[in-house]
Amino acid sequence: MIPQISQAPGLVQRVLDFLEALKQNGFNGDTATSYADRLTMATDNSIYQLLPDAVVFPRSTADVALIARLAGEERFNALTFSPRGGGTGTNGQSLNTGIVVDMSRHMNRILEINVEQGWVKVEAGVIKDQLNQYLRPFGYFFSPELSTSNRATLGGMINTDASGQGSLVYGKTSDHVLGLRAVLLGGEMIDTRAMPTALAETIALDETAEGRIYRTVLNRCREQRALILEKFPKLNRFLTGYDLRHVLSDDLQTFDLTRILTGAEGTLAFITEARLDITPLPKVRRLVNVKYDSFDSALRNAPFMVEAKALSVETIDSKVLNLAREDIVWHSVNELIADVPDKEMLGLNIVEFAGDDRALIDGQMETLCQRLDELIAQRQGGVIGYQICGDLAGIERIYNMRKKAVGLLGNAKGRAKPIPFAEDTCVPPQHLADYIVEFRQLLDDHNLSYGMFGHVDAGVLHVRPALDMCDPQQEVLMKHISDRVVALTAKYGGLLWGEHGKGFRAEYSPEFFGETLYEELRRIKAAFDPDNRLNPGKICAPLAVDAPMMQVDAVKRGTFDRQIPVEVRTSFRGALECNGNGLCFNFDVRSPMCPSMKISGNRIHSPKGRATLVREWLRLLAEQGVDPLALEKQLPQQRLSLRGLIEKTRNSWHAGKGEYDFSHEVKEAMSGCLACKACSTQCPIKIDVPGFRSRFLQLYHTRYLRPVSDYMVAGVESYTPLMARAPKVFNFFFRQPWLREMSRNAIGMVDLPLLSSPTLRQQLSGHRATTLTLEQLEGLSAEQRAEHVLIVQDPFTSYYDAKVVADFVRLVEKLGYKPVLLPFSPNGKAQHVKGFLTRFARTARKTADFLNRVAQLGMPLVGVDPALVLCYRDEYREILGAERGDFQVLLVHEWLQQRIADRAEQPATGEPWYLFGHCTETTALPASGQQWAAIFARFGAKLENVSVGCCGMAGTYGHEAKNLQNSLGIYELSWHPTLQRLPRQRCLATGYSCRSQVKRIEGNGVRHPLQALLEMIE
C-alpha cells in the first residue's frame, strides 16, 4: 500500500488574502492554489524549476488592472508577480516565485482588424498560429516565425522579442508591434505607440507614473545615445531587454516606448493587448532542400544561399535528421527530402524563395539550382543533391519537421539529453562557420554530444549539448560551458541571446551592455517598477534596490529528479523525460494531442502536466523511502483481505472528508486522460501518459477504493458475451429511464450502448465462418490455409456493432478468400485503461498464448477495431515482454493492402468518400489514411482524409457520467462542425468509439470504410 503524502508546500497568508481581495472586488478570472496547479507553472521549456505561490488567470484587461491596483496597496507590497504566456520559454523567462499571472487561458481574443491600414489588435494570450489562421482568408499573416508557433502566445513573443525563420527579411517581433496596452503596478494603464518626440516630451511633464517613465526613458536614451550606438551590435537579431537602440529614430524625431516593453520579459508592466502590423501572404513560395556530406559544408555554403536572394536559410545537422527519421513526422517528408543513392546526408539547408512575382522567384531559384548542379558535378562544397518543393502543403510539412527539431533532440537515447542554455547565440553570419568550429571544439573537448539547427542566414544556430542534469558534476559543467560561450560570442561580435530572451541568463547582461548602459537599464526598471516586484531577478534590478539576479546555475528540474532512484527514473522514463517543449498545448482542435487539454484549457490535463505531477509524486514517495517498483512486483501475489478492505474503506472515507493526500491531485489529473495514446507518438519525447497513468492508478488503488464504474469497465469483456445471448431483453432494460437514471447515479455510467440485434452469430447463422474449430483449421493443407483469413474479434464491434464484422466476413468472401471467425478471446484493453494491470497481464498472457497458437497456422489474423488491434502491439509487448510471442494481428486496411497490391487503380467515379480516422490509429499509423485512400482508388472511388481531432468517446470515457460534458465538448471542437458540412452518408470512421459517438450525438451514425468497399463491390 502506498503511503499518504500529506505534506505539500504551504501558502503564505498574505497570498490567500490577496486572492480573497480579488474575489471580493469583482475579479472575473480564475485563481489556483493547489500544489498541482503550482507545479504545472513551476517549469517551462527550460531546465529550471521554481514553484510559484499561486496562479491567477485574468479574463480581461480590467481583471489585470484589478490585480495591479490591489498589488499597489500597502498590505500587499511584499507580493511579487510574473506574467506568463504559453510557457514555452527555453530559459525560464516566466518562472518565478510569487504569483503567476497567466494570460493564455482566457485572454485569447482577436479584437479588431483593419485590412486597409494593415493591422490587427489582439489580446496577449492569442497564439501565433491562431492569429495566422484568422488572417489567412484576408490574405495576410503575422510574419515573425518561431518553432513553437502553435502554442506560443503573442504576449510571450512580445516579451521576449521573439523571432525565427525569415528574420533576415521579416525582422523580430518588435519590428511589427505598432502599439501596446500595458498595465503598471498600481493599476495605471498606458497605451504606447510611435509618436513625435515633441509629444513624448509633453507626456513626460505629467506627474503620473506614465509621465515618470517617459521622462526617464527620454533622458537616458538621449544622454547615452552615442554609447548606445557604439555598444549595440549591428545584427539582425539586435540587443533587447531593454532595447535602448530603437526607442528613438535615427533622426531623433520619433519616440516609441513600445520598444522598451518588447523584450522586457514582464519586468516592467503587464502587457494585455497589442496592435500588430500584418504582412501580405506571398503569392509564390518555393523551397530548395540542399543536401550535404557534412554539417560544416552546409554552414559554409549558407552565405551563398543568402546572396542568391533567398528569404531564409534553415540548417539542420545529422543528429536532428536521424532523430526525425525515427519520429512520426518523417513519413510526411521522406519523399521531399529523399536520401541520395550511395551518399550519406549529414547536413541539410532548407532554402526558401518567396514573393509575388513568379518569374522573378523562379529565376532566383533556377540561378541557385544551376550553381548547385555545378558544385555537384565538380564535387565541391560538400553538396550531394537537392530537391525542389513548390506546393504549399509540402512546404508546410517540411517546416513542421524543422519546427519539431527542438523536441526531437529531447528524445535522444541515454540519460544525457540535449538541453537549452546556450541555444540561441547570434554572430555576424559571415563569422558563423568559424564560430561554430570553436563552439564544437569546446563541446568535443568535454566529450559531449549535441544537436545543431537554426537560422544560418541570420547567424543564429541552436546548439543543445547533451547533459544529465541529475548529475551534479554535469550541472557544474553546464555553467562552465555557458561562461565559455559568453566569451566566444563576444569574441565574434555576437550575442548570447539572439532569439529566446535572457531569463536566467540575465547575469551576463553587464558583459554585453557594459556597466554604464547596464546602470541605465536599472534606471528604466526603477521608473516602471521601483520596488522590484515584476518578475524579479530577470533583466535587471531597479537602481536603488540591492537584489540578486537569477543565476544560470539556479535550481533545476534535475535537482528534484535526482532525488528519485535511478531505477525508478528509468522505469518511469515516459514521465521523467518530458522536457516541457509544450507541443501538447497545440491550439489546433484538429490536432489529436491532447483532447483533455483542449477542452479544459487546464495544463494539469496535458501530457506535460501529468508528467510533471507523476515525477513529483515519485519524488515524494522516494522521500518517504517507498519503492514503487517493489510495490508493483508484490501486487500479483497479494490477495484481497478483510483487513485490507477495511483499511481502504477508512482511507477513502477520510479522503471524502477532505483529508489531504497529494496522490488525489495526481489522480484527478489522470482521471481526465482519455487514454487515446496520441501523446505516445505525437509528442517528440514520446511521453506515454496512458502507460504511466495505468501504473499510477494501480498503485493509487492499493490505498483507496475503486468506484463501481471501474469494475464495470474492466469487466466489459466478461459480461458482454453473456448479455449478447439475450440482446432484446437487455436492450429493453437499457432503454428504461429508471435504469438509465440508476446507472448514472449508482454506477456513474451514462448512455449505455445497445447490444447488436440480431447478434453477430444470428447474422452469420449457418455460415462456414462460424463453424470451423481450431483443430479443423490445423488439419488444413498449406494450399487450403492460403485461402483463409482469420478474423480476431473484439468486444465492441462483435457485440455492439456486429454488422461491421458481418460485412467484413462478406467482404473477405467477395475478394475470393474464406473468412473464419475466431472464438472471442478478451483483449484486456479496458483493464489496462483503468489500471487493473495484474488482471490485464493474466488476460494478455492467455490471449497471447491463443493467438500465438493460431498464428502458427500461417493464416493472416485480422482485427477490425484499431484501438484493440494496436493494444496487441503496444500494451501486450509492454506488459508481457518476450512472453508476448511474435503473433501479428493486422488491421483491415493492412490486410487489404497486401491482398490487392497488384490491382490497378481505376478512374474515380461518383462523389468522394470522407474518412474520419481513429486518434490512436492515425497517430500510431500515420500512413493509414493514405493507405485507405489507395485501397479505395483501386476500386474506382475517391477517399478524402478529414482532418479532425478526437471525437470525445475514447472507449468508455464518454460513457462515464463525470466525463460527459467534456466528451460532448470535445466532439463539438472538430467532429460536429466537420460532419455538418459533409454528406453524412459518405462519411466513414474506422473506430467503434467514433461511430458510437456520432450516433449518440447526431442520432444517426457513420459506417466503417470496409462497409463502403463492400457496397462498391456488390
PLM region descriptions:
Residues 529, 536, 690-1018:
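Iron-sulfur cluster-binding electron-transfer modules in prokaryotic oxidoreductases
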Residues 157-159, 163-250, 254-325, 330, ...:
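Mobile "lid/hinge" segments at catalytic clefts and subdomain interfaces of large enzymes
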Residues 5-9, 28-35, 78-80, 143-145, ...:
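Flexible, glycine/charged-enriched surface loops at secondary-structure junctions
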Residues 546, 550-581, 585-723, 841-847, ...:
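Ferredoxin-type iron-sulfur electron-transfer modules in oxidoreductases and energy-metabolism complexes
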